[in-house]
Amino acid sequence: MEKYIMSIDQGTTSSRAILFDKEGDIKGVAQREFKQYFPKSGWVEHDANEIWTSVLAVMTEVLNENEINADQIEGIGITNQRETTVIWDKNTGRPIYHAIVWQSRQTQSICHELKEQGHEETFRNKTGLLLDPYFAGTKVKWILDNVDGAREKAENGDLLFGTIDTWLVWKLSGGEAHITDYSNASRTLMYNIYDLQWDDELLDLLNVPKQLLPEVKESSEIYAHTKDYHFFGQEVPISGIAGDQQAALFGQACFERGDVKNTYGTGGFMLMNTGEEPVKSESGLLTTIAYGLDGKVNYALEGSIFVSGSAIQWLRDGLRIINSAPQSENYATRVDSTDNVYFVPAFVGLGTPYWDSEARGAIFGLSRGTEKEHFIRATLESLCYQTRDVMEAMSKDSKIEVNNLRVDGGAVKNNFIMQFQADIVNTAVERPEIQETTALGAAYLAGLAVGFWDSKDEIANRWQLETEFTPQMSEEDRTKLYKGWKKAVEATQVFKLED
């Protein structure tokens, strides 16, 4: 009877369950989208119970559709949208407020206040992160400050906080395990990535009671077992956890210092493994934990792009100038260039290296001759320019030149984007055979803990190249195009509307 690892990939817009066999090949996939809530401009929320029911649904579906029994599952790995924050009542199991999503800007005023009080460096020096609404800490404070009775309940020990991994493990284990892993803890603004513990000073600044917080574990170990009533009568080990971007780094077998991967999902995320030494950034990158394994912690530098694949979604759903995401490649290749049109997709601000949360999207260089093909091409190119911004910062901080870029995420299927990416960064872009690297990374972490796979070496040997895109553009063109992008970003940052 063949055995499998199940990966739960809980993302920003959907939950998926993916089965991997011993070869690391995909045996089955089930996916379910869930509702996005936008209560005010710039706010993004999810219903944590909807997330939970979507996860139960895909777990059931992937087994049923592929006629696999629950006793064929050796372990479960969880990878999750990071920073998204849930607080729930531990007695009733009910969330006290919607989950506040990583993209949400509703804690802007809290961040501003902490900066005004001069605390930015304190957070930076201990967590490797910036004081930005993106991270979980200010979201926790917001919920405690804004939900009636929440603070009192938290101080009495009746509430629990978790990122989505923590919430799912708590639910799957029937409330027995309140845990997270190093990679997720490192995204909270409350965890000291050098001392590897929740930081009392930061908790005081955010006014967050310590009893709210989960226990931090390695990224690969048996944390708990599923309750049999959640998993067809089986108690299956939950044995791997990593935030989505760290899971993708692991799934891309980026185990050596200097290895880099870039994910083109809803947002864009580049991570460089910096080994067992954290690298402090002078260029607006984040210092974060890649994973904890075998008693060691590996660190990473990370660049975050807030709008990547979601810009293509916007062309489809917002402007309705394409019918499907793949169609964007067709339109973009009908013209030789953007005809000097630049699009800066700063819908929710600009991430690395600018960290300008007040910037908003802008289009430059329009003329009477601009057609939709030019604009669609400019949108696709914007993903690549933002990636170069991050890559330059990364090389500068780490003093490591990036020689090849491993890529994953929905947009990598677009050959135009991949070729333009190679051209604009002047580096080979490697698209792997298995592009579900986030889910694969979680599966690898879970599988290592239960002996399904033996070692990182075995995993590294399984990585296979599908297509390599090599630079074709002249240095002159590359320099000119990128210079235009930098001007467009600069102009975007200047344009600010008063409240």
Curated annotation (Swiss-Prot):
Pathway(s) per entry: Polyol metabolism; glycerol degradation via glycerol kinase pathway; sn-glycerol 3-phosphate from glycerol: step 1/1
Q: Which residues are recorded with the post-translational modification Phosphohistidine?
A: H230
Provide the residue positions that the database annotates as binding sn-glycerol 3-phosphate.
T12, R82, E83, Y134, D244
List positions binding ATP.
T12, T13, S14, T266, G309, Q313, G410
> What's a single GO MF annotation on this record?
glycerol kinase activity
Activation and inhibition: Activated by phosphorylation and inhibited by fructose 1,6-bisphosphate (FBP).
Enzyme class label = transferase
Quote the CDD domains the UniProt record gives.
FGGY_EcGK_like
Q: Which GO terms describe its biological process?
A: glycerol catabolic process; glycerol metabolic process; glycerol-3-phosphate metabolic process
> Which Pfam family would be a valid example here?
FGGY_C
Q: How is it modified after translation?
A: The phosphoenolpyruvate-dependent sugar phosphotransferase system (PTS), including enzyme I, and histidine-containing protein (HPr) are required for the phosphorylation, which leads to the activation of the enzyme.
Q: Which residues bind glycerol?
A: R82, E83, Y134, D244, Q245
Name the catalysed reactions: glycerol + ATP = sn-glycerol 3-phosphate + ADP + H(+)
Keywords assigned by UniProt? Answer: ATP-binding, Glycerol metabolism, Kinase, Nucleotide-binding, Phosphoprotein, Transferase
Gene3D superfamilies (alphabetical): 3.30.420.40
Biological role stated in the UniProt entry? Key enzyme in the regulation of glycerol uptake and metabolism. Catalyzes the phosphorylation of glycerol to yield sn-glycerol 3-phosphate.
Family as reported in the entry's similarity comment: Belongs to the FGGY kinase family.
* Quaternary structure and interacting proteins, as annotated: Homotetramer and homodimer (in equilibrium).
Q: Which NCBIfam families would you find in this protein's record?
A: glycerol_kin, PRK00047.1
Q: What is this protein called?
A: Glycerol kinase
Q: Which organism is it from?
A: Staphylococcus haemolyticus (strain JCSC1435)
Q: What is the lineage of its organism?
A: Bacteria, Bacillati, Bacillota, Bacilli, Bacillales
